[in-house]
UniProtKB/Swiss-Prot annotation:
Places the protein is found: Secreted
EC number: 3.4.16.5
Function field: Involved in degradation of small peptides.
Residues bearing glycans: 111, 430
Signal sequence, renumbered to the chain: 1-17
Identification of the protein by name: Carboxypeptidase Y homolog ARB_07161
Record organism: Arthroderma benhamiae (strain ATCC MYA-4681 / CBS 112371)
Similarity section: Belongs to the peptidase S10 family.
Record: residues binding substrate: 406
Length: 486
């Protein structure tokens, strides 16, 4: 089995009624962990507002089961959950899946077989939306991809209609076929997570990363049980941004100050101040690593590092997602197309065609991102999970060379710092130029060893398939074919 890098993000929720309209939160409504987190936030962030960190559930209207083409109950599936090398009850009986066949002619996204629906966590009231597209080539043999967006708090529908899906949305809200869609040679599942992102919903928002894996495990178990025709192919998990999760803060000063391949954005005094803040930032992060359950410690560290190493760049007006230009549209994360996608998906005929139960779609949720920050999730050492993954799964980590927030210097650094048997050989290897397999132009630089590969993609920002669609499809297909995996 091969796999692209991703960390799974889904949160916890409480019991949920069939329909819900949100109301404002007050401090007296917070209990347990939420109250602990809010106390930590107030202590570290003067003037913090409750609504910035704890959002009510997304408004929704659940459709009756008979409106769906089918459903599958978890209790009909016999499986185990493996945790720390031990078999444990999977809890799959707590889940169910509702689905429908999407008529390709209804929206014109693509003419391939499509399914959409919801994974339902009956115990916690989570409902995660998915949209599946069959491969354009040979779905019987082509691999299956699970795509997860980052943020945290951005819908995978944004990547579907902006980057690697079968169609792109224009300013006029019309669709154009994407000739460089990743479903040219693979079937793709786009999953909206965590809860209250995109078309997913639940009574309580997501707070951190670790609660994700069981929900995604349940989704995949039920999906492949219901659609066994896709269960025998190679399977990959792919994602971007926060899906990769960890970027060393020490990489920000050199990237902003002319050492990442592009001209400096900041002046020398600011660069020196940022460099001077790196040791303290690293100390704060280590404190969080040493006490990962201490929310106040992790929040304090994340705030210090963000204030010292990210805000100086943000204040310039330059896009944190592409060092080559200004932020065109701050309300849509510097990408105007995100606003077009939201308008397209908020059309009633679109929502009806895919069975969406959330009437107001937002591409990215600042509330979700703030919640993850508030729970200290930003500084958690999840990259330490990668060595265990490398025992069984090949991992490709790619980064656009013009991205600031997840810059290639930092991504390369953490791949070289991983504690795994191939570390020393991987570190010693130099980056070598990769050429497009057909057009023969240089698309990036790569290094790889024993199942781990790092790829620096030329002339690309944060969203690589958006900036370099041909090159992204080329390296994606080559990875699927087994290149860079020895």
């Amino acid at each position: 089995m091969k796999g692209l890098l991703s960390l799974l993000l889904v949160g916890a929720a409480n019991a949920l009624a069939a329909s819900y309209e949100p109301r404002s939160l007050t401090e007296d409504m917070l209990q347990g962990k939420e109250k602990e987190v809010w106390d930590a936030i107030k202590g570290e962030i003067p003037g913090a507002q409750l609504d910035d960190y704890f959002n009510p559930p997304t408004a929704h209207q659940r459709e009756p089961d008979e409106k769906w083409d089918g459903k599958l109950e978890g209790k009909s599936v016999n499986t185990l959950w493996v945790e720390e090398g031990k078999d444990k009850p999977s809890g799959i009986e707590e889940y169910g899946m509702r689905f429908k066949t999407v008529d390709p002619s209804s929206l014109g996204v693509d003419n391939v077989t499509q399914y959409s629906g919801y994974l339902d966590n009956k115990k916690n009231g989570q409902h995660l939306f998915f949209w599946f597209f069959e491969s354009r080539r040979d779905p019987q043999y082509d691999p299956v991809i699970l795509w997860l967006n980052g943020g945290p708090g951005c819908s995978s529908m944004t990547s579907l209609f902006m980057e690697l899906g079968p169609a792109r949305v224009g300013q006029d809200l019309k669709l154009t076929r994407n000739p460089n869609s990743w479903n040219n040679r693979a079937s793709i599942i786009f999953l909206d997570q965590p809860v209250n992102v995109g078309f997913s919903y639940g009574k309580s928002g997501a707070f951190n990363t670790p609660s994700a894996s069981k929900d995604v495990f349940a989704f995949l178990t039920l999906f492949f049980k219901k659609f066994p025709q896709y269960a025998l192919q190679d399977f990959h998990i792919a994602g971007e941004s926060y899906a990769g999760h960890y970027i060393p803060f020490a990489s920000y000063p050199p990237m902003a100050c002319g050492k990442g391949g592009y001209s400096a954005v900041l002046d020398q005094p600011t660069c020196k101040a940022m460099e001077a803040a790196v040791p303290q930032c690293q100390k704060e992060i280590k404190r969080c690593y040493d006490k990962p359950t201490d929310v106040a410690t992790c929040v304090k560290g994340a705030k210090f590092c963000k204030d010292a190493l990210v805000r100086p760049y943000s204040r310039t007006g330059q896009s944190i997602y592409d060092i080559r230009g200004r932020c065109e549209d701050p309300k849509d994360l510097c990408y105007p197309i995100l606003g077009w996608i939201a308008k397209y998906l908020n059309q009633r005929h679109v929502q009806k065609a895919i069975g969406a139960e959330v009437s107001h779609f937002k591409g990215c949720s600042n509330h979700i991102s703030s919640q993850f920050f508030a729970h200290g999730d930003y500084n958690q050492p999840f990259h330490r999970k990668i060595p265990g993954i490398l025992k069984d799964v090949n991992v490709l980590v790619y980064a656009g060379d013009a991205d600031y927030i997840c810059n290639w210097l930092g991504v390369k650094e953490w791949t070289e710092a991983l504690q795994w048997p191939g570390r020393h050989i991987f570190r010693r290897k130099n980056l070598s130029v990769v050429y497009h397999s057909v057009n023969k132009w240089p698309l990036g630089r790569v290094k790889y060893h024993n199942g781990l590969a790092f790829l620096q993609v030329f002339k690309a920002g944060h969203r690589v398939p958006y900036d370099q669609p041909e090159n992204a499809l080329d390296f994606f297909n080559r990875w699927l074919a087994g290149e860079w995996t020895p």
